[in-house]
Design a protein with these regions (language model features):
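N-terminal capping segment at the start of a domain
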Residues: 3-43
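A non-catalytic alpha/beta surface segment that caps or lines the substrate-entry region
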Residues: 32-77
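Buried hydrophobic packing segments
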Residues: 53, 107-117, 250-253, 257
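Catalytic-core environment of secreted peptidases
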Residues: 60, 72-105, 234
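Beta-strand segments within the central parallel beta-sheet cores of soluble alpha/beta enzyme folds
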Residues: 67-69, 87, 123-134, 268-274
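A generic, well-ordered mixed alpha/beta core segment in the N-terminal half of proteins
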Residues: 96-167
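Midchain, well-structured core segments that form catalytic/ion-binding scaffolds
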Residues: 135-136, 140-301
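Short amphipathic alpha-helices in soluble, non-transmembrane regions
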Residues: 305-315
């Protein structure tokens, strides 16, 4: 990207204190447990966080565009406005027990880039757009990366708008409720390059004493929701050999998920993240179990192999338990 102005590249620095203060101010919205955040997508807290981000961007001379999925695009004009922009961004929504930096750092660092180059009197040849993607986490409305998926042509708008949360509220209705649906058709935006600054979400950098790492590949992801149907029965009066215990089936499949991921190393991972048994009574054998499986690998062949093997093992487990 060509730069013009009074600063030279060797002297270009952001204001780290200002970025930190912005992160801490955003973290006041939707406080969570242990100093983290609960600012799930399309909640009132999400709307408040969006409004604060917009205010900061407009104070920095940026203009907002909003598409029909609620994706926010804050534009800093370049010297040649007809050139395709460079995008910087991530997401402001969090997990229910999320941290202060996951996603938020990628959005607010983009804002800090704009603030800093303005402070230094620098003009870029290309426009810069700081993006906030809606529902990247997917914790409230599955799947993750829903609105960016519509932008990329992976999902259509009807599919996204019909996604439901645990209370039966739809993505579309909640987006309208908080007032952050725009008019722009998703995906109708030229992008010269996209940069996302993100926390590691893992222990490797800290364990190796490193400050920063460069992403070398993305994780392929397979999500599955499983329902096992057994038979409710009294725990005290039903003989062991006559039980159809859906909870036991869930436990065995959970163990299989871990073992299969370990068999596909390096880089493959797997876990059961959500789990519920019904009727969820201490003296009733579960007649139904509902749980989610998360398999990931940068290698498509490994990802496919893990899924195929688990499906075969889960079928045998279900047969064995009746």
């Amino acid at each position: 990207m060509t730069l013009t102005g009074t600063a030279v590249a060797d002297n270009m620095k952001i204001d780290g204190d200002r970025l930190w203060d912005s992160l801490m101010e955003m973290a006041k919205i939707g406080p969570g447990v242990a100093g983290g955040n609960n600012r799930q997508t399309l909640t009132d807290a999400d709307a408040e966080g969006r409004a604060l981000f917009r205010m900061w961007c407009e104070e920095a001379g940026m203009n907002m565009a909003l598409d029909r999925m609620g994706n926010m695009f804050m534009r800093h004009e370049g010297e040649e406005p007809d050139l395709d922009p460079v995008y910087i961004g991530s997401h402001l929504d969090t997990q229910p027990t999320g941290g202060k930096y996951d996603g938020v750092l990628g959005v607010l660092s983009g804002l800090e880039v704009i603030r800093s180059i303005r402070d230094m009197g620098i003009r870029t040849r290309r426009p810069i757009v700081v993006a906030n993607w809606t529902n990247e986490e997917g914790t409230r409305f599955a799947p993750a990366m829903l609105a960016s998926g519509v932008f990329a042509g992976i999902h259509d708008e009807d599919y996204a708008n019909s996604r439901e949360d645990a209370e039966g509220r739809t993505f579309g209705a909640e987006l309208d409720r908080i007032g952050w649906r725009g008019d722009e058709e998703p995906g109708r935006r030229p992008i010269h390059a996209m940069f996302e600054y993100h926390i590691e979400q893992g222990p490797i950098l800290e364990a190796e004493g490193k400050q920063v790492g460069i992403v070398t590949h993305g994780q392929g992801l397979w999500w599955l929701q499983v329902t096992l149907l057994g038979k409710d029965a009294h725990t005290g009066s039903t003989p062991m050999e006559m039980r159809m215990n859906a909870g036991l089936g869930m436990a065995r499949i959970t163990e299989a998920v871990h073992r299969i991921a370990m068999e596909h190393q390096p880089d493959a991972v797997g876990a059961v993240g959500q789990a519920n048994v019904y009727p969820n009574s201490r003296n009733v054998i579960p007649g139904r179990a509902v749980f989610t499986i998360d398999f990931r690998s940068p290698d498509l062949d490994k990802l496919t192999s893990m899924r195929t093997k688990l499906e075969a093992e889960a079928t045998e487990i279900a047969k064995d338990l009746g």
